[in-house]
Amino acid sequence: MKREWGKHEHIPASCIYFCNGTEEAVDLIMRAFALFNRDSVVAAVPTRTVYARRAAVNRLEYREAALRPSDFELQAETVLNAVSETTQLVFLCSPNSPTGNLLDRGELETILQLFDGYVVVDESYIEFAPQASVLELLNKYRNLIILRSFSHGWSMAGVRFAALVAYPEVIETIERVGMAHPVGAATLSAVADVVKHRLDVDKWVRQIVDERTKVRMALSDLKECKQIYHSDANFLFVRFADSAAVYRYLLKQGIAVHPVQGCLRITIGLPNENSALIGALRKR
């Protein structure tokens, strides 16, 4: 399986570790490279809650570095200022959730160059912007760990499958804290079948990207919609005149979105689901 997926992504099998979803991947990284009750981790926020959650479980101090408020861009100086003597890991999500934007590569490289610990780039949504992957940086930085998920672009959320990609010595350290047989045969078989049909996955991703454009255009016509941030993921981050009221209204209509910092994270679904969302907002 490592050879098959690695062939698609141009990654040697020795640089790959498979595990049961993003939550386990983050947990393994923390257990491998940070000591509980002593070390800390930094994350650029707003971002996924999994980093804070696993830090708490592993008794690690969780430190936040704010993305630039105007456009949620990564700023290396802010991240490095959040780092302390106990910081072993920096977590960056690109495309970022919930904001949807890719993080600036130049800023990322500055962090990789100046931070002594490991930088984890979570590319769980990278299938929606494959040209932006930082995989090639593995040849340059031994302190880079890349996290990939099969939940979004691969549409296998129920399978709970993820991959960690890093320098072989890093993978060996992760293997020492992981289970002897981390992923079951049934899961590997299901994933292998999807990997063999990569063209179908690419078709699905293109459909989501097309739908994202349509939803964005429809939202921009609404008077209540004040700002739609650029997205390279399978969702949009939208600011409404009263986002809290819109959130409550949609919930009553049976439509679930995620409220974050005065905005709503809206997942792009099937065409009929997107039409239902826009239809409900137009009636408000």
Task: Kindly label every feature range from the protein language model.
Residues K2-V41, N58:
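Phosphate-binding glycine-rich loop
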Residues G106, A244, Y249-H258, G262-R284:
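PLP-dependent enzyme catalytic core of the Aspartate aminotransferase-like
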Residues V45, E64-P69, E123, Q261:
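Short beta->alpha connector loops at strand-helix junctions that form conserved
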Residues P69-E123, E127:
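Active-site phosphate-binding strand-loop segment of PLP-dependent enzymes
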